Amino acid sequence: MKTDGNTTLDTTISMEELERTVKSAYEALAKDQQDDGHWIYELEADVTIPAQFILLEHTLDKIDEELEQKIANYLRRCQSREHWGWPVYYGGEFNISASVQAYFALKMTGEDINAPHMVRAREAILAHGGPEYANVFTRIQLSLFGEASWLATPFMPVEIMLLPRWMYFSIWNMSYWSRTTVAPLLIVADLKPKAINPRNVHIPELFPTPPDKVKTWIHGPFRSKWGHVFKFIDTAIRPFTRFVPSFLHKKAYKAALDFIEPRLNGVDGLGAIYPPMSYSAVMYRALGIPDDDPRAATNWEALKGLLVIKEREAYCQACVSPVWDTALSGHALMEASFGPDGINADRTEKLIDRAAHWLRAHQVLNVVGDWAINNPNLQPGGWAFQYGNDYYPDVDDTAVAAMLLHRQNLPENEEALDRARKWIIGMQSSNGGWGAFDIDNDKQILNDIPFADHGALLDPPTADVSARCISLLAELGHPEDRPVIERGIKYLRKEQEEDGSWFGRWGTNYIYGAWSVLCAFNASGVPHDDPSVLKCVNFLKSVQREDGGWGESCETYEGSAHGVYTESLPSQTAWAVLGLMASGRRTDPAVKRGIVWLIQHQQDNGEWAEEPFNAVGFPRMFYLHYLGYKQFFPLLALARYRHMEKSGTNNVSFAF
């Protein structure tokens, strides 16, 4: 049921109805726990990843006909009926890179290019300039298939692997996702292999200008004058590569493989994300490594582990999110069982015991990851996002998982909490904030090189991640950590937007950032009448929709108004309500309207519906849809409101 936005919304909340909603949501979430105690939900990205998987199968001639037809069904469904291209998030504008890759993949699967949807897609691609305006990763695909020469890709010599940490363009100054992607890609770009392409499929019809006539493939965006400088250097330096001594070239190859192979990470794959795994598959084939070699075979298994295969459709995820899903699900269930009137206390204890056991087993305690380049004496103690990614734990997952273990309040969690606390403190950047995976990963000039047209080569501190770290440290309550917390709060104050919100680097967007920071401020003792808090509260109230909910589009990463969308969404409504309650506004009509919206939009099965994307990988380029968000965040918000209403308090007692 949707409320008429032109009418005054009734904010009367029936406690009986609230009780029923919370219990139904609890059951829906509890049933999804896996046998070993963890939760895992689908993590959908845009069409580029499934399209690239089809292209990878044809690059290597490892074609699964049934699978690729299911992926083709998915690609057809995701095609826009407005602009007939493919967006990079639900309901988004035409995107040239996604559209070129999806069209190419569909043609690979045998799609008739004269079918109406293919004709319209082709017309849209041509109207936007064709593949020469696509991003770097699309142009790499084109080069592999011979649709364009390797001159269409940025110059990335494998000798980059030899650069020491103190040199700006060292891989150690890149983000983890860039570092793991670049290492195999450097070898691929050097060897310039050609896809097997057994069906001999090509896409000349997409090029308004023949590829060999294109004068420049580097179109920006140029974020500073350095972008133009690096474009010139890219062209000027290429002829000199033949003068690189062969011994140095071989040494660079060895350095690349010495980096990659210890991090192959078994069936979880290099970096536990799709791009490094896919380039590793191409790299091993180009190096002449047989497919049955354990390195190549296991890497292929890791890639297949990202597939979501259903009856009619299939798609490939960019990665999986079990640690994140488990910690967030645990928080929601514990909130529902909190207090003397909590529901299912005994059952929840058993569910959380199993989740905590699983989390403790997945804490990274013995592997010194890449993060140590900036703090070599720091002892490991974090969690990764995926099942296994020991070289790359992140502070966000670590904070949320540790807060769950702390809330459980059992002796067996003490060592895990101590290791997590010390690791997070050691990961604080010099400006007081936290990046997700690295310390001081903020050499912005790197985002000006031609390879970084996505603008996400780095992992600088962000407000949302920093807020979670502050929340954990405040919750743990060690007096000696107060200077660390204060530096973090100072960083957050500097990062506040003019309208009172905070940027959401990993969740969409300013509503997510606002919720994250308000929770951290509350946990760390920032008064509810602090000017920063009041300004953020006013922001959240100003963007509440007439139906009582909140919604925000991924367009906000591209410059549109903060906190605005065409519909209210369960996850974002929950974030806004949680943020307002953390600022002492439990009795505010805005909170009540949000709670009413969540109650009214719950489905009969205890779940909520949410199709739009709710998170981001790389702003302006790559967005995500966490299918678990629509479940655990509404339950967390409703359960918290229920407890606060029953106890008559306006103070949130927990940090998350």
Swiss-Prot record:
Gene Ontology annotations of biological process type: triterpenoid biosynthetic process
Pfam families for the chain: SQHop_cyclase_C, SQHop_cyclase_N
Site note Transition state stabilizer, residues: 324, 506
Ranges that cross the membrane: none
Keyword Repeat applies: yes
Renumbered ranges of PFTB repeats: 68-110, 417-459, 485-525, 533-582, 591-634
Alphabetized UniProt keyword annotations: Isomerase, Lyase, Repeat
Active site residues of this protein: 396
CDD domains the record matches: SQCY_1
Role noted for this protein: Squalene cyclase that catalyzes the oxygen-independent cyclization of squalene into hopanoids, a class of cyclic triterpenoids including hop-22(29)-ene, hop-17(21)-ene, hop-21(22)-ene, and hopan-22-ol.
Family, as annotated: Belongs to the terpene cyclase/mutase family.
Protein name, per record: Squalene-hopene cyclase
Source organism of this protein record: Schizosaccharomyces japonicus (strain yFS275 / FY16936)
Gene: shc1
